[in-house]
UniProtKB/Swiss-Prot annotation:
Binding site for ATP: G30, G31, P32, G33, T34, G35, K36, S37
Protein name per its UniProtKB record: UPF0273 protein PF1931
SUPFAM superfamilies for this protein: P-loop containing nucleoside triphosphate hydrolases
Lineage summary: Archaea, Methanobacteriati, Methanobacteriota, Thermococci, Thermococcales
NCBIfam families per record: thermo_KaiC_1
Length: 247
């Protein structure tokens, strides 16, 4: 039996036929505004509610901003940080300014993937993490796309070895067909793609599970909403040819 990690996102575990297989590294790919960060933060928060410690690696936003964004959905992680159940890895500020006073885990040189991995590994050990989010992994190879797959594989080796189940947020530009970075889709166990499409003059959100090692899953494109409590996915609805149909 494959052990599964529940995302806890309403509707999502149904689409994944029970959740993400344990130790999988999932690429969460999408354009701007599709809800990638919210999805990954909700995954971590729900883990905390299930007693699974988690780590958020902030590469795109200041850690303070990330905490504020999460708190807007009612996901206040500070208590869990104090209890040693949640850790933020600051890979955004490089320790410039006030961060070095109150962030425990700081990556100073993003071009040094070994430093990045060492800081992450330390954080995982310290809190015995079960879930890890890297937001976004694209930042690690934005200036050296040829390294994308190699970087993904290095990270995956470390994370799977520690027993963590992970989400790598991957940015793609509007209308781009791939998953962000050459070959990255071959280096991961799963791919979930979030989309925002203009249909009849209105933006509609949908997601599709492109692949997921270790489990069957829905092959359909499902609509989802972002509410004040986070993401809700509709497993009983499908988006096709611009229209939403009940299954």
């Amino acid at each position: 039996m494959v052990r599964r990690v529940k995302t806890g996102i309403p509707g999502m575990d149904e689409i994944l036929h029970g959740g993400i297989p344990e130790r999988n590294v999932v690429l969460l790919s999408g354009g701007p505004g599709t809800g990638k960060s919210i999805f990954s933060q909700q995954f971590l928060w729900n883990g905390l509610q299930m007693g699974e410690p988690g780590i958020y690696v902030a590469l795109e936003e200041h850690p303070v901003q990330v905490r504020q964004n999460m708190a807007q959905f009612g996901w206040d992680v500070r208590k869990y940080e104090e209890e040693g159940l949640f850790a933020m890895v600051d890979a955004f500020t490089a320790g410039v300014g006030k961060s070095k006073e109150y962030e425990k885990y700081i990556v100073h040189d993003l071009t040094d993937i070994r430093e990045f991995i060492e800081v992450l590994r330390q954080a995982i050990r310290d809190i015995n993490a079960k879930r890890v989010v890297v937001d976004s992994v694209t930042t690690l190879y934005i200036n050296k796309p040829a390294m994308a797959r190699s970087i993904i594989l290095q990270l995956k080796r470390v994370l799977a070895g520690t027993g963590c189940t992970s989400i790598f947020v991957s940015q793609i530009s509007v209308g781009e067909r791939g998953f962000g970075g050459p070959g990255v889709e071959h280096g991961v166990d799963g791919i979930i793609r979030l989309d925002l499409d203009e249909i009849d003059g209105e933006l509609k959100r949908s997601l599709i599970v492109w692949k997921m090692r270790g489990t069957s899953h829905s092959m359909k494109r499902h609509p989802f909403d972002i509410t004040d409590k986070g993401i809700i996915v509709y497993p009983d609805k499908v988006l096709k040819r611009g229209r939403i149909y009940e299954l």
